[in-house]
């Protein structure tokens, strides 16, 4: 039923425009694609093309291509569905300033700080992953190309300088991040596509391997599931993205639509380009190279720069360097946004219990978070944290935060009951598989 107003005819309540209390013309104007939408698509793609894509070929090389294909059939559809659900549960929240406040709005302050802490731990692990990756891989490239005699990563201060620069850039605001990330992300997409095509000439059918026994295939597919998901995963940027849209848009429906649209565009681009690249790279890089990369704790691209020879080797090495460095840099930016938001939510939750909100110095809190982030990332670099092991360890937390908690909210909160359905069962099953994955990996 359409309702007349001084702004025009409000659309039927069953349509997005109607739910937003707008006419169709007002709705079209409100959801116009703008520079902010482009920025969040770029940030989402930048987040996804990070440790996932540069480390996935190592895991696939260790496990086999058949395992990867099975985990892809399970993982990619589930990933799309749970990222969509994650956005919807955030967008519906009465208060949307940070992840802990969203949970607090649904379940109360105690649940907010508990589940916010879980979300925080997931982001801490990814801070470890990217800070270690950018330090080790950049040092490896500089050494491989003869720029340095030894590995700069042997010095703890090299990593400290890198992290200080990245955190300083990340803390300057969304607009600067969008500008810096756009060129790097577009370059990454072109490089991923070009590298996938260039690898075709180096394919070897024996790298396909034989089909393993069913039991072993299923077990290894579950172990590989976290690596498959993280190859195009950008859940770390979804919370900052929804919060950004909620702060900009008066209508929750408009904010939800824009966030879902950005997610859909990013997912579609990533799936087409990254899946082809991952399969192509895996067919070109054998098991021995994967083992070597695992033992050296470096990415597949870093090891490719060492083993590729013949015509085009120089080009492959150069674009591998560009992809790897840009990948971990833009992914670090995305993770830092989520980390800052999660940390601020926990700190503010605690401080509001101790003092009135108006007495809290938010600028001081943000500076403290910057220093904390630098020290945290530097500690991972000094310890040379094993990246692939962290991905497995993070799996249960990711299963809880990305799948099981949103699913639980759907059953717990009446306003979210509309999201029940078969897709929710797939999300729950995927969450449970992610929870058991590391136990199978280390068994």
Curated annotation (Swiss-Prot):
UniProt keyword Zinc present: no
Phenotype upon gene inactivation: Decreased secretion of a number of substrates for the type III secretion system (T3SS) encoded in the locus of effacement (LEE) including Tir, EspA and EspD; at least EspD is also decreased intracellularly. Expression of 105 genes is altered; down-regulation of LEE PAI (including the T3SS) plus other genes as well as up-regulation of 21 genes. Decreased ability to form attachment/effacing lesions on HeLa cells; those which form attachments condense host actin less well (pedestal formation).
Residues that span the membrane, as ranges: 38-60, 65-87, 111-131, 150-170, 183-203, 215-235, 265-285, 319-339, 368-388, 390-410, 422-442
Example GO BP: serine transport
Main location: membrane
Gene Ontology CC terms, in alphabetical order: plasma membrane
Taxonomic superkingdom: Bacteria
Expression induction or repression: 40-fold induced under conditions that maximally induce expression of the locus of effacement (LEE) large pathogenicity island (PAI); part of the dlsT-yhaM operon. 3-fold induced by D-serine during mid to late exponential growth.
Subcellular location: Cell inner membrane
InterPro entries registered for this protein in UniProt: Amino_acid_transport_2
Alphabetic keyword roster: Amino-acid transport, Cell inner membrane, Cell membrane, Membrane, Transmembrane, Transmembrane helix, Transport, Virulence
Membrane topology: Multi-pass membrane protein
Role: Transports both D- and L-serine; allows growth of strain CFT073 cells normally unable to transport D-serine on that substrate. Transport relies on the H(+) gradient and is not competed by L-threonine. May play a role in L-cysteine detoxification.
Similarity annotation: Belongs to the amino acid/polyamine transporter 2 family. SdaC/TdcC subfamily.
Protein name as catalogued: Serine transporter
